[in-house]
Regions:
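A conserved short coil-to-beta-strand element within the FAD-binding core of flavoproteins
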Residues: 1-14
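Short hydrophobic core segments
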Residues: 4, 22-37, 206
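Switch/communication elements of ASCE P-loop NTPase nucleotide-binding domains
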Residues: 8-11, 23-30, 65-67, 72
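Conserved flavin/dinucleotide-binding core of flavoenzymes
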Residues: 13-15, 40, 61, 76-254
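Glycine-centered tight beta-turn/hairpin loop motif at sheet-sheet or coil-to-beta transitions
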Residues: 18-20
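Flavin (primarily FAD) binding-site architecture
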Residues: 28-49, 66
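Short glycine/proline- and charge-enriched loop/turn segments
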Residues: 44-51, 163-167
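Central beta-strand plus flanking loop segment that forms part of the substrate or channel wall
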Residues: 49-77
């Protein structure tokens, strides 16, 4: 697999370069996190506001640690499927079945818990987690067999777990990724207006992007859901009549006026 390095648009199509290969298409749906998007050379280039969003939008801190054990060290009555919360920096804990015997524990570290452990190397991070877990299950260190770590916050392709707007960022960057860039439509949880940072937002964005590509192919101007109606509502002070279609998202939009 090769990373996409450039996307060049022409009058009749798009050329996507990945490694030494170039792929051509009529249209492209770009569903990569903002961190990855910032590493792709776009022609034509992104707008100034979009470039600012690439550099300034916050992403949540998130790491995952998979601890492997020779055997389960907890009793059958223990419920570890996301139901253990700790103030010792452990986050949320799940039991995951191993393919060949043994047992695995998946630990999700997020927020400050993940941020603090960035100062540790992989093995140091695992040791810190084992020390804390061993207080609950004293036989855990003796049954420990290995680990795997995924640092989403430090991953150059993700830059974090999901979109997490900071102060002032909603006002500056909300809805800017809903508008296609010529033949390129943007998708992903970070592009959804109502549910950013969620699976539902990602699904909604895919539906929107597909609809936009369909409109572009048909020679139509893609319509941003709710945008035309919101603009009309701002110009007309009188209440809507029964014959007019109300904007279902107006209440949410007014929160940021």
């Amino acid at each position: 697999k090769s990373k996409v390095s450039s996307i060049v648009q022409a009058k009749d199509g798009v050329a996507v370069k990945a490694g030494s290969e170039t792929y051509k298409a009529d249209y492209v749906v770009l569903a990569v996190p903002l961190k990855a998007l910032g590493q792709i050379q776009m022609t034509p280039s992104l707008s100034g506001t979009q470039m600012s969003a690439l550099k300034g939008t916050n992403y949540g801190w998130r790491d995952q640690i998979l601890l492997k054990f020779k055997r389960p060290v907890w009793d059958d009555k223990s419920r570890l499927s996301g139901e253990i919360f700790s103030d010792q920096g452990l986050g949320m804990i799940w039991v995951e079945p191993a393919l060949k015997g043994g047992a695995n524990v998946l630990i999700n570290l997020s927020g400050d818990n993940a941020r603090v452990l960035q100062a540790f190397g992989d093995r140091q991070m695992v040791d810190q987690v084992l020390i804390r877990m061993n207080k609950f299950y004293p036989k855990m260190r003796g049954a420990f067999a290995g680990y795997e770590i995924r640092r989403y916050s430090a991953d150059p392709g993700t830059g974090g777990s999901y979109l997490a707007y900071g102060p002032g960022q909603v006002t500056r960057f909300w809805r800017i990724w809903e508008q296609p860039l010529s033949r390129v439509a943007f998708a992903g949880e970070h592009t959804d207006a109502l549910y950013p940072g969620t699976i539902e937002g990602a699904l909604r964005s895919g539906k929107r992007a597909a609809s936009q590509v369909r409109d572009l192919y048909a020679g139509k101007t893609p319509v941003i859901e709710g945008a035309p109606m919101v603009a009309k509502a701002e110009k007309v002070a009188a209440p809507t009549t029964g014959g007019e279609k109300k904007n279902p998202f107006a209440w949410f939009t007014r929160l940021f006026d």
